[in-house]
């Protein structure tokens, strides 16, 4: 009896791999769990061709997303500076702080494009001034914007 069998995964499985990966598993695991639950397919030449085709399409999509992120990064640097207006006390200290949501809102107003607030890294801002803010646009593309905090 074979020690390991090869299967192609149909979905992401946490401890095993991602959709489309070719993995070696125990024959019982493949026979009793992966194959009956349609979480994997046995390896055949046809399945391997489908996997290659799917990977090529995925690579094209990923390249397009990366290019879009690079274009957006260029747009952000072209704009240069974003301004957030906050209420300030007499000594120049903000009431509250500048949050990721505030930055996302200002960027959306200027570029008409949504940014997930969780992808924005804002330093601790407690006063009026100029700050650098990091925005993660893609796994490999980050943008740094200049943020000016003013009073209203």
From Swiss-Prot:
<dbReference type="GO" id="GO:0005840">
    <property type="term" value="C:ribosome"/>
</dbReference>
<keyword id="KW-0687">Ribonucleoprotein</keyword>
<dbReference type="InterPro" id="IPR009027">
    <property type="entry name" value="Ribosomal_bL9/RNase_H1_N"/>
</dbReference>
<dbReference type="GO" id="GO:1990904">
    <property type="term" value="C:ribonucleoprotein complex"/>
</dbReference>
<dbReference type="GO" id="GO:0006412">
    <property type="term" value="P:translation"/>
</dbReference>
<dbReference type="InterPro" id="IPR036935">
    <property type="entry name" value="Ribosomal_bL9_N_sf"/>
</dbReference>
<dbReference type="InterPro" id="IPR000244">
    <property type="entry name" value="Ribosomal_bL9"/>
</dbReference>
<dbReference type="GO" id="GO:0019843">
    <property type="term" value="F:rRNA binding"/>
</dbReference>
<keyword id="KW-0699">rRNA-binding</keyword>
<dbReference type="Pfam" id="PF01281">
    <property type="entry name" value="Ribosomal_L9_N"/>
</dbReference>
<dbReference type="InterPro" id="IPR020070">
    <property type="entry name" value="Ribosomal_bL9_N"/>
</dbReference>
<dbReference type="GO" id="GO:0003735">
    <property type="term" value="F:structural constituent of ribosome"/>
</dbReference>
<keyword id="KW-0694">RNA-binding</keyword>
<dbReference type="InterPro" id="IPR020069">
    <property type="entry name" value="Ribosomal_bL9_C"/>
</dbReference>
<protein>
    <recommendedName>
        <fullName>Large ribosomal subunit protein bL9</fullName>
    </recommendedName>
</protein>
<dbReference type="InterPro" id="IPR036791">
    <property type="entry name" value="Ribosomal_bL9_C_sf"/>
</dbReference>
<comment type="function">
    <text>Binds to the 23S rRNA.</text>
</comment>
<comment type="similarity">
    <text>Belongs to the bacterial ribosomal protein bL9 family.</text>
</comment>
<dbReference type="InterPro" id="IPR020594">
    <property type="entry name" value="Ribosomal_bL9_bac/chp"/>
</dbReference>
<keyword id="KW-0689">Ribosomal protein</keyword>
<dbReference type="Pfam" id="PF03948">
    <property type="entry name" value="Ribosomal_L9_C"/>
</dbReference>
